[in-house]
Amino acid sequence: MADLDSPQKLSGVPRPPDGVGGGSCSEISTELIRSLTDLQELEAVYERLCGEEKVVERELDALLEQQNTIESKMVTLHRMGPNLQLIEGDAKQLAGMITFTCNLAENVSSKVRQLDLAKNRLYQAIQRADDILDLKFCMDGVQTALRNEDYEQAAAHIHRYLCLDKSVIELSRQGKEGSMIDANLKLLQEAEQRLKAIVTEKFAVATKEGDLPQVERFFKIFPLLGLHEEGLSKFSEYLCKQVASKAEENLLLVLGTDMSDRRAAVIFADTLTLLFEGIARIVETHQPIVETYYGPGRLYTLIKYLQVECDRQVEKVVDKFIKQRDYRQQFRHVQSNLMRNSTSEKIEPRELDPILTEVTLMNARSELYLRFLRKRISSDFEVGDSMASEEVKQEHQKCLDKLLNNCLLSCTMQELIGLYITMEEYFMRETVNKAVALDTYEKGQLTSSMVDDVFYIVKKCIGRALSSSSIDCLCAMINLATTELESDFRDVLCHKLRMGFPATTLQDIQRGVTSAVSIMHSSLQQGKFDTKGIESTDEAKLSFLVTLNNVEVCSENISTLKKTLESDCTKLFSQGIGGEQAQAKFDSCLSDLAAVSGKFRDLLQEGLTELNSTAIKPQVQPWINTFLSVSHNIEEEEFSDYEANDPWVQQFILNLEQQMAEFKAGLSPVIYDSLTSLMTSLVAVELEKVVLKSTFNRLGGLQFDKELRSLIAYLTTVTTWTIRDKFARLSQMATILNLERVTEILDYWGANSGPLTWRLTPAEVRQVLALRIDFRSEDIKRLRL
């Protein structure tokens, strides 16, 4: 029996999905139907055919539904027919025109190419003819100019000949007139050699006679003959002789200068200045000539030759300076003195002062001169390198750096500055030590003399290094000054503070009549009253206070010095001195200097803490302890009496005022304010201790609140620091002691506290509540805090 489920056996193709027609033919062939004999198979085929019929009917219905749309589109297409025929005709006509234009353009462009080729050949022919004529003209012109000794004109003809295209001349030699051209070339070459010899000879004569107009005349001819390097070399040689002659003349004047002369102390710096100004004047005068006749980029060559001569003359001047000023011997002497345990006789710092000033002036003049050269050469290179590659520009920059950084002038100045730094260190250290040793105090002044003297010396040394225009030198001196202030000078002040603020006999007298009588009785037994001890103690107290002022002024002076250096060096960097690396080095040195200011502030704080501990605390504690002797378990009558005759706080305020008056007169406002802040902190801490040892009733708590308010009001007037924060705990204790009943604390605690931040812990609150004798301990314990 046939397999009806197999499409291959029924039709040989897969069955399509429902709704998709298979065309006008059934998938089941007639032969298949005829071959079927089984009823079930026939019924299956019948059902299949019925299904296909339904699909075909649906497709026909769908097509019939589209009939109107299709017919309307067909009508539209019929209407478009004539237009499409017109478009077809226009397109064919346009294609014909494009083809014609293309052919025409091709013909025209080929003719243009032919014309362009002919034009180029014509130009070449004209150029060749012009070159031949130029060659003849140059030959005739150079002969005439040489006969008339018109060397400029002769050089112009030779220059024109040298600029001719050699390939064109070579082609001309191969033509019919080759022999004539060869003859002309030979004559021109002979004239060229002859003119070179004449110009060289005439230039030598002019330089020998010192005839500057003639020297410049023939100097301008060299580049026309292609002798750029030779011209610059010979002209530089002439200029170097002028520089050497003037420098030797100036050096002779130096050696003959009387030491009483106004400029005798800086005569060598003046000599270098004259040398540098002379070379700068030469560069300014002849730069236009070099740029005009030799072209941009050639000034470097001229300056390179001049710098060699400058180095020779600088070496002579510096040698004379070292010898006459005994510079190296002074350095060795200083070096020996700087060594620890040195037994050699110390050199007087004043002897070094003029030498150090002259060295920095010499270096400053050198730096200014080198900056001038760098600026001139750089601007000349920029013009010449406008179209050059980056590699060429970098190579020129390397040449410039090498010339200025490695010249003998730079090396010599670096050596002098190296010795200068050591000598300046010695000058600063010895002068600072002398200022400390000669320290004096004038009555009415807050500081002693050494602070102003020391910072005058430090500023002078750093300022002198700054005047050298060398960032390395300046940074070295800032570092040395930082070390001197941080170590040596700070140690002096630290030692004075560590001696402490003495507890004097007069203080003992103030503490009570009993101790005063005892001291006087002891003194009378010895037959005298020891006023010297009192005087020396007063001096020690004054010394301590003055030292505190000195420390504070030192910190401020260092900060001011840092700001001044920042301002001054901004000007230096804006002038092109140094670079990013130098700027970073300078900033690092200033950071170290600023750190020293912080160390002086730390030392000041240590001194204030010492003063507070030794001079204020021993006095304040007994005054506060008298609070315990005043009862705060009082009745209405006592409360009223306390209001009329205050038992404690007014006397305490008076004692504080009297004690702090001594310090107010002897300390700067800033230090006094800081000391007052420490004193208020001490009062707050000590008063809290005695309050916790006292007992109160309701009126006693109210009395304590009044006393505390009076104390806070007074302390607020004597300092700019915040007082209320320091007395916050005491104020909260006063609030607690003022409560009418224990549970009233809950109105101020927790969620009910509002903006109030409690400084007391729950345990401390209970402790303060327990100070009220009228509060039961059971009620306090029951509180939930």
Curated annotation (Swiss-Prot):
Positions of the UniProt region annotated as Interaction with STX5: 85-153
Q: Does the keyword Acetylation apply?
A: yes
Tell me, in one coarse class, where this protein mainly resides.
cytoplasm
Region span, Interaction with SCFD1: 2-84
Residue ranges of the region described as Disordered: 1-25
BP terms from Gene Ontology? Golgi organization; protein transport; retrograde vesicle-mediated transport, Golgi to endoplasmic reticulum
Q: What Pfam families would the database entry show? A: COG4_C, COG4_m, COG4_N
Places the protein is found: Cytoplasm, Cytosol; Golgi apparatus membrane
Question: Quick one: where's region E domain?
Answer: 741-785
Region D domain, annotated ranges: 618-740
Q: Which residues carry this modification: N-acetylalanine?
A: 2
The UniProt keywords, alphabetically, are:
Acetylation, Cytoplasm, Golgi apparatus, Membrane, Phosphoprotein, Protein transport, Transport
Gene Ontology CC annotations of this record: cytosol; Golgi membrane; Golgi transport complex
Residues found modified as Phosphoserine: 6
Disulphide-bonded residues: none
Q: What membrane topology does this protein have?
A: Peripheral membrane protein
Q: InterPro entries from the entry?
A: COG4, COG4_C, COG4_M, COG4_N
- Complex and partners: Monomer. Component of the conserved oligomeric Golgi (COG) complex which is composed of eight different subunits and is required for normal Golgi morphology and localization. Mediates interaction of SCFD1 with the COG complex. Interacts with STX5.
Extract the PANTHER family matched here: CONSERVED OLIGOMERIC GOLGI COMPLEX SUBUNIT 4
**Protein task:** Required for normal Golgi function. Plays a role in SNARE-pin assembly and Golgi-to-ER retrograde transport via its interaction with SCFD1.
Question: Per the similarity annotation, which family is this?
Answer: Belongs to the COG4 family.
Which protein is depicted?
A: Conserved oligomeric Golgi complex subunit 4
Source organism: Bos taurus
